[in-house]
């Protein structure tokens, strides 16, 4: 009997089972223990293969692929700390709902806790963060193939959102020519190999019941809060709120067109808050809100009813309002709960919005970080997409810009870490094949610098704008101790990214004014390649501009 041959047949069943659940993208890191899984994926024509040498980046690449494709994405890594490097992407997927299938190769049980090389306790190592976990036994013909395939099917059928961790121990030898070992075992699955359906099919209902009193609540004074959602959902939500005559407070990731832009500015005005207190119901569609003032208002508002609608299960309201948590796809929920044409009830807020927008526009000519955030709409590629980093940049865009309705916007706003942002953006581009504008800060770029290797393989124009404000300037907005701020919070690195771009053979520009930036962008959008554009800005100007605007608008 050939151990290596049966390992591969066992792995082939696993990978083929994944294809029956919509898995098309497989992300693979180099490794020896994962050889059976890697070869099974490589030999399956149903897969699109992606490779990367860094498992942390690989996990985020898969996350980006899943964001766009809306299908589960598989990740294959070897044993040991390679597995641990998937943790950040796994956590993010658990909070934002992307489906990741983590296939982690492992040593067999007899090599765990005995000093064997590259052998750690992998089973259960991700604690409660995966939505589902599956620890497979060592491959053996004593276990029928139908058990293996139905076990995979069951786990995937139960996976509504987040990650499925499948730990796969393999004994040596891992290499060798294929022979007939296990062929009969494999063939007992019969014509399943030629079919396209799962061996075990399970139906899972995901739809919220129609709220029978909706006809009553839609006649009241309401507020719509729009969080993270798809581009199509964003357009539908905007139309729905407009028909109802309810003010729509749209997050940067809502893709609603933010009909009341600069919400993070005007929500700091007491007149706006007073008017919003008249709302009898708040309907929040989508989670992961960005703006600080929006979150502060959301935490203190006390409507008669607060509804949260999202297809992710669990509590998504950190303020714990009394109301309803409705698990449903946003578009489906809107169809069940049509709007009734009514006149807008807010009078003061539209006036404040116009005045706040005027204050922002008055600053747009200065070459700086806050002004870039305001202008970002002008730089979006036609028929393309935007990926927004975390920390200060996403807050500035949320507060100072107005993105087009239905324009695809992606970000990692679950755990909101700065790790893996470039890798995620690379995955977003690969899955969509669209022109992509990504914007991150300098520390975020440094954190994921080796992901520039992934940008060598883009299929359409890709522009990475690195806003270099020399450190974590988000902490300039927080009451961090002045005497310790630079060393222990900002951590300026005093670096530029020209050599990093050159190392990966990427085009690079460092514009010093808006005309040079627009010229660099015009050239970048004409070529299906990646371009790094570094904007070197004064360290604290972005944070100071936001604070000044907040002060101005609060006194309108």
UniProtKB/Swiss-Prot annotation:
Q: What does this protein do?
A: Catalyzes the thiamine diphosphate-dependent decarboxylation of 2-oxoglutarate and the subsequent addition of the resulting succinic semialdehyde-thiamine pyrophosphate anion to isochorismate to yield 2-succinyl-5-enolpyruvyl-6-hydroxy-3-cyclohexene-1-carboxylate (SEPHCHC).
The pathway entry for this protein reads as:
Quinol/quinone metabolism; 1,4-dihydroxy-2-naphthoate biosynthesis; 1,4-dihydroxy-2-naphthoate from chorismate: step 2/7; Quinol/quinone metabolism; menaquinone biosynthesis
Cofactors required = Mg(2+); Mn(2+); thiamine diphosphate
Q: How is the cofactor bound?
A: Binds 1 thiamine pyrophosphate per subunit.
Which family does this protein fall into? Belongs to the TPP enzyme family. MenD subfamily.
Q: Which GO terms describe its biological process?
A: menaquinone biosynthetic process
Pfam families reported for this sequence: TPP_enzyme_C (PF02775), TPP_enzyme_M_2 (PF16582), TPP_enzyme_N (PF02776)
Q: Which GO terms describe its molecular function?
A: 2-succinyl-5-enolpyruvyl-6-hydroxy-3-cyclohexene-1-carboxylic-acid synthase activity; magnesium ion binding; manganese ion binding; thiamine pyrophosphate binding
**Keywords from the UniProt entry:** Magnesium, Manganese, Menaquinone biosynthesis, Metal-binding, Thiamine pyrophosphate, Transferase
What assembly does the database describe for this protein? Homodimer.
Query: What are the EC numbers?
Result: 2.2.1.9
The root-end lineage is: Bacteria, Pseudomonadati, Pseudomonadota, Gammaproteobacteria, Enterobacterales
The reaction(s) annotated as catalysed by this protein in its Swiss-Prot or TrEMBL entry are: isochorismate + 2-oxoglutarate + H(+) = 5-enolpyruvoyl-6-hydroxy-2-succinyl-cyclohex-3-ene-1-carboxylate + CO2
Q: Does the keyword Plastid apply?
A: no
What protein name applies here? 2-succinyl-5-enolpyruvyl-6-hydroxy-3-cyclohexene-1-carboxylate synthase
């Amino acid at each position: 009997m050939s151990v290596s041959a049966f390992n591969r047949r066992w792995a082939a069943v696993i990978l083929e089972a994944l294809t029956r659940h919509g898995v098309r993208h497989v992300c693979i890191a180099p490794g020896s223990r994962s050889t059976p899984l890697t070869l099974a994926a490589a030999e399956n024509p149903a897969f699109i293969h992606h490779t990367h040498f860094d498992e942390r980046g690989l996990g985020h690449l898969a996350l980006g692929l899943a964001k766009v494709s809306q299908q589960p994405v598989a990740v294959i890594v070897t044993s040991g700390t390679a597995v641990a490097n998937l943790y950040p992407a796994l956590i993010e997927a658990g909070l934002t709902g992307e489906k990741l299938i983590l296939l982690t190769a492992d040593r067999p049980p007899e090599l765990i806790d005995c000093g064997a090389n590259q052998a750690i306790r992998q089973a259960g190592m991700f604690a409660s963060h995966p939505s589902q976990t599956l620890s497979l036994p060592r491959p053996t013909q004593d276990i029928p193939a139908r058990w293996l395939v139905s076990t995979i099917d069951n786990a995937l059928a139960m996976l509504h959102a987040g990650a499925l961790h499948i730990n796969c121990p393999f004994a040596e030898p891992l290499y060798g020519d294929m022979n007939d070992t296990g062929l009969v075992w494999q063939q007992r699955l019969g014509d399943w190999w030629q079919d396209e359906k799962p061996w075990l099919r399970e139906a899972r209902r995901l739809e919220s019941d129609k709220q029978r009193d909706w006809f009553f609540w839609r006649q009241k004074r309401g507020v719509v809060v729009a969080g993270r959602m798809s581009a199509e959902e964003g357009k539908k939500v905007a139309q729905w709120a407009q028909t109802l005559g309810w003010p729509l407070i749209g997050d940067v990731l809502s893709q609603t067109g933010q009909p009341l832009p600069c919400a993070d500015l005007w929500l700091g005005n007491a007149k706006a808050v007073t008017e919003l207190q008249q709302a009898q119901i708040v309907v929040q569609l989508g989670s992961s809100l960005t703006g600080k003032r929006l979150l502060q208002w959301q935490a203190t508002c006390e409507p008669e009813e607060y509804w949260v609608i999202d297809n992710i299960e669990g509590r998504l309201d950190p303020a714990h309002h009394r109301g309803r948590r409705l698990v449903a796809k946003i578009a489906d929920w809107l169809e069940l709960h049509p709007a009734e044409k009514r006149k807008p009830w807010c009078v003061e807020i539209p006036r404040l919005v116009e005045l706040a927008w005027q204050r922002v526009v008055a600053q747009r000519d200065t070459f700086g970080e806050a002004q870039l955030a305001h202008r970002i709409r002008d730089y979006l590629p036609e028929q393309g997409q935007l990926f927004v980093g975390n920390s200060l940049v996403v807050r500035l865009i949320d507060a100072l810009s107005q993105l087009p309705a239905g324009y695809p916007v992606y970000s990692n706003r679950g755990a909101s870490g700065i790790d893996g942002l470039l890798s995620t953006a690379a995955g977003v581009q690969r899955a969509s094949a669209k022109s992509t504008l990504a914007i991150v800060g300098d520390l975020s770029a440094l954190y994921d610098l080796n992901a520039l290797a992934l940008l060598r393989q883009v299929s359409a124009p890709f522009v990475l704008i690195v806003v270099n404000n020399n450190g974590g300037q988000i902490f300039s907005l927080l009451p961090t101790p002045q005497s310790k701020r630079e060393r222990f919070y900002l951590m300026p690195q005093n670096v530029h990214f020209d050599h990093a771009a050159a190392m990966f053979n990427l085009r690079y520009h460092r514009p010093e004014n808006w005309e040079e930036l627009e010229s660099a962008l015009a050239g970048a959008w004409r070529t299906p390649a990646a371009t790094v554009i570094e904007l070197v800005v004064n360290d604290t100007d972005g944070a100071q501009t936001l604070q000044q605007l907040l002060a101005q608008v609060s006194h309108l």
